[in-house]
C-alpha cells in the first residue's frame, strides 16, 4: 500500500513539474562578436512572470548574428557574419528537453558577410543571404541535421542611386513563401525582390516565371514577410525608412505592388534612420517595423485589402533595434538592440496592437536576432 501511495505522489510531483515547465519557453539570441559577446545565447522565458533567464551561451567568435530553427525544432542554424572574405554557417543540435545547443558542423556560405538564414518547410534546404558578397547560397540539410556543402549559388549584379549604400549588390534576406514553392530574395542595392522557384529535394533554385518585383529606386529592400492568409506580403525599405505592400499570385509567385514608400517614422523625427525588421501578428491584424535611429517600432493596422494604416509608434527602450519577435501567442514582443546591448520586453494588446513596456531589459552584448523555439 505504501508503495502504491508513493507511486501516486511521484506521479503527481512529475505532473506538477511538467506543468511548471510548460509555462517556460526557450529563446535564442544571435549577436555580433564585440563587447564581450560569447556568440549565441539561450534563454528560458517565463510567460507568467514575463522574464528571461539565461541558461546557456555557445562560444562563436564569428558574429552569429542571425538564426533560424529547423521545422522539427531539433536543429538551429546560424550565419557566421564575421570579417572573413568568405562567410560561413553553423549547425547545432537542440536538446528538446532543455533547449540547449550542441555544435554539429559548419560550412562556407560562398560569399562574404552572410546576414540572414532561413530553412524551407520540409527541413531539407537552407538559404543564406550574403550581404557582402551579393549572393544567395543554397545548402542541403543532412539526415542528422548537419549542413552539407552548398548545392547552388546565385550571384546578383547591379548598382543603385544611393552611391554609398548601393555601390554593389547586397543580398539581405531570403523568405520562403507560405506554400514553400518560392523563395523571395531582397537585394538592398537593386531595389528588387528576386523570385526563385524551389526544388527542396535537390536544394536548387531557378528564376520564377515572373523573376522579380521592383520598388522605388533608392528604397533599399531588406526584410520581407507574408500575411498569414498568403495573399499579401510586406517589404522593409531600409534606406528610405518605409514599407511596401504587395499582393501575391499563389500560382506563379508573382508580386503586384499595392503601396510603396509608406512612411514608418514618427512625424516629429528629423534625425538619421534606417529601418531593419518586420513582422505581422498571427491574426494578421497588425504589422510592426523596427527603426534604427528613431529607436521605435512603427505599428500599422492591416486592412481587408492588405493595405497599411499607421496607428502608432512605440519607443523600444534601447539603441539600434534590429530583429524583434512577436511571441507565437501574440502576448509579447521582444526587441534586440545592437548598440545598447539589451533585449526589451513589451506586453501587446491584441485588440489595438499597441505595446506597453514591461520594464524588463535583458543584458545581451550586441544583440541582433531573437527567436523562440516551438515546444
What annotation goes with each model-predicted range?
Residues 33-36, 81-85, 132-135, 190-192, ...:
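Short glycine/acidic-enriched loop and turn motifs that connect beta-strands
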Residues 99-173:
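Asp-box/WD-like beta-propeller blade repeats and closely related beta-sheet repeat scaffolds
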Residues 53-59, 102-108, 158-164, 208-214, ...:
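A short beta-strand motif characteristic of beta-propeller blades
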Residues 43-50, 92-99, 138-149, 196-205, ...:
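Short loop/turn segments immediately following beta-strands, especially the blade-tip
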Residues 54-123:
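Blade-loop segments of beta-propeller domains
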Residues 1-24:
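Bacterial Sec-dependent N-terminal signal peptides
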Residues 36, 61-72, 110-122, 157-180, ...:
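Beta-rich, blade/repeat-based domains predominating
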Amino acid at each position: 500500500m505504501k508503495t502504491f501511495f508513493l507511486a501516486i505522489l511521484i506521479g503527481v510531483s512529475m505532473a506538477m513539474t511538467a506543468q511548471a515547465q510548460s509555462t517556460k519557453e526557450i529563446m535564442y539570441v544571435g549577436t555580433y562578436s564585440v563587447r564581450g559577446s560569447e556568440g549565441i545565447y539561450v534563454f528560458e522565458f517565463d510567460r507568467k512572470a514575463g522574464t528571461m533567464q539565461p541558461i546557456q551561451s555557445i562560444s562563436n567568435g564569428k558574429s552569429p548574428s542571425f538564426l533560424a530553427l529547423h521545422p522539427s525544432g531539433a536543429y538551429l542554424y546560424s550565419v557566421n557574419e564575421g570579417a572573413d572574405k568568405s562567410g560561413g554557417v553553423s549547425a547545432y543540435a537542440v536538446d528538446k528537453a532543455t533547449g540547449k545547443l550542441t555544435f554539429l558542423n559548419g560550412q562556407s556560405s560562398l560569399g562574404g558577410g552572410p546576414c540572414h538564414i532561413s530553412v524551407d518547410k520540409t527541413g531539407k534546404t537552407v538559404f543564406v543571404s550574403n550581404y557582402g558578397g551579393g549572393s544567395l547560397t543554397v545548402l542541403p540539410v543532412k539526415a542528422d541535421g548537419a549542413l552539407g556543402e552548398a548545392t547552388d549559388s546565385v550571384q546578383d549584379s547591379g548598382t543603385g542611386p544611393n552611391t554609398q549604400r548601393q555601390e554593389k549588390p547586397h543580398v539581405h534576406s531570403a523568405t520562403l513563401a507560405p506554400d514553400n514553392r518560392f523563395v523571395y530574395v531582397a537585394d538592398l542595392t537593386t531595389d528588387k525582390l528576386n523570385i526563385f522557384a524551389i526544388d527542396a529535394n535537390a536544394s536548387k533554385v531557378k528564376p520564377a516565371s515572373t523573376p522579380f518585383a521592383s520598388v522605388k529606386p533608392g528604397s533599399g529592400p531588406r526584410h520581407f514577410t507574408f500575411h498569414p492568409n498568403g495573399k499579401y506580403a510586406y517589404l522593409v525599405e531600409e534606406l528610405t525608412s518605409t514599407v511596401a505592400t504587395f499582393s501575391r499570385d499563389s500560382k506563379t509567385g508573382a508580386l503586384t505592388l499595392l503601396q510603396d514608400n509608406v512612411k514608418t517614422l514618427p512625424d516629429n523625427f528629423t534625425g538619421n534612420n534606417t529601418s531593419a525588421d518586420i513582422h505581422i501578428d498571427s491574426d494578421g491584424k497588425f504589422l510592426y517595423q523596427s527603426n534604427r535611429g528613431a529607436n521605435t517600432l512603427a505599428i500599422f493596422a492591416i486592412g481587408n485589402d492588405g493595405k497599411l494604416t499607421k496607428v502608432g509608434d512605440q519607443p523600444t527602450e534601447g539603441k539600434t533595434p534590429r530583429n524583434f519577435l512577436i511571441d507565437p501567442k501574440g502576448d509579447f514582443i521582444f526587441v534586440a538592440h545592437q548598440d545598447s546591448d539589451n533585449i526589451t520586453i513589451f506586453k501587446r494588446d491584441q485588440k489595438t496592437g499597441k505595446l506597453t513596456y514591461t520594464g524588463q531589459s535583458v543584458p545581451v552584448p550586441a544583440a541582433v536576432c531573437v527567436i523562440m523555439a516551438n515546444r
